[in-house]
Amino acid sequence: MMQSFIRGTSSRAVMEHEMQDLMDQDPPSFGVRKLCQKGWSIAEIDGSILNHDTHGFDSFISALAHHDQELMDELRKTLIGRGIQVPTMNGNQKFINLDNSASTRTFTPIWNTFRQTLPQSEPVKQEIIQEVKTICSDFLNAPLADYEVIFTSNTTEAINLAAENLSLESDNTIEPVVLNTLLEHSSNDLPWRMIPGCSVVRLSIDGEGFVDSNEMEGILKAYNQEGQFGKKRIRIVAVSGASNVLGVCNNLKEISRIAHCHGARLLVDGAQLVAHRKVALDDCGIDYFAFSAHKVYAPFGSGALVVKKDQLHFTPEEMEQIQISGEENAAGIAALGKALLLLKRIGMDRIEAEEQVLTRKVLTEMAQIPGLDIYGIKDPDSNRFSDKIGVIPFEIKNKIATQVGKELALIGGIGVRSGCHCAHITVKHILHVGPGLEKFQKLIVTLFPKLSLPGVVRISLGIENSEADIDRLILALGSITDKQNKSSKKEAKRLMNKFVDAMAEQIYQTV
């Protein structure tokens, strides 16, 4: 049945049939030789577990260029947890998730793929893992002839592997340096600090979060060409593909050009990038690319390091231990493969375009709320707006970030993230928290543990979000900034306890 989908037929009837087949929520029955017949492509053990015929697929997309929106709409209907009600000060309301940067929820086809993989035999699981490597390679434009795909548990483990790989370089004539930025998540900061004898230098960022390519070139030249710092040489430039705090996407192609021009390699923390933008490792000249499945609608404990083969310093025995030590998370890897296939079928250009519309709406309407300050790119008409994903950090005057997060939940049933977002360096920078103030804050928190350190509130969009979600957000923010509106903490606690008791009872009854 899926052959017509792969060949690229433009028949409207067939398209609707295949779309339903793709989204079917009923678990298929499968025998000894089949993984699934619905929701995935080809499932013969002796054939292709996950058909990734990109030529046929591209033909299909081309023929149905005006229907990718329908596929996205159908996918949204299968969101796990869609329509769940949560208690608020205004009664039960549908939960709105605006915390996609922390972790994305999943969809039924991806969930089905995960659970259908669990009972499979080891040979089938190994076939699936190899197929998903090809899917990752295709999705990221990282040819398997040149790149190795190493599955991990998350981005942090992937970057730890890259850091360990750097530590294996045997050149006693230099002291390795990693060039980082002020934008980095702890996953792309702490691993580099753990390398013996390695130091970290950070690039500054401007008011919107962008690095200065001239500063970068100057630092690389000073270290690698002029030898101004003795034996220290920058070996890796490690940057985020998209900031998890400010949402900005720096020019990876330009960063790669400068890095390679001065004898350094480029590692990209792609955790926040993969679900939002088209990525081309080969075209950009990226040497290492790390990402997590839970940021890309497959929250089942997998991730990957995609690395140029000529950059690996592990022995064949060490590589084998890395890849197959213990039992691999085949089901999580399969879910990742399914998620990437779905994103490609929808089209990353479509996903980016929709997200830009919502981001523009958020920025425009939040700018009208008194006492609310947005960090990073604020103006949707800025010429750099196109370099921003749907991540918007903000604060409300005279309110602690964690309190704003709680009030959004209580008033609107909206889930956001507040605090430092595992990017303390970035948040301290944008809030202008100097060393003296930081020490004072730590002392205060030690004396009064219930107090929260300064942070920002973060809204982060995903493909599940709609303009209606933004409307509810703006309404709730308006209510929070209205000084006349005072919610009762006692009533909020009562509602929450009632909700928890009801959910617990429901779970026990189900069991």
Regions found by a protein language model. Give the residues of each.
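Pyridoxal 5′-phosphate
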Residues: 2-511
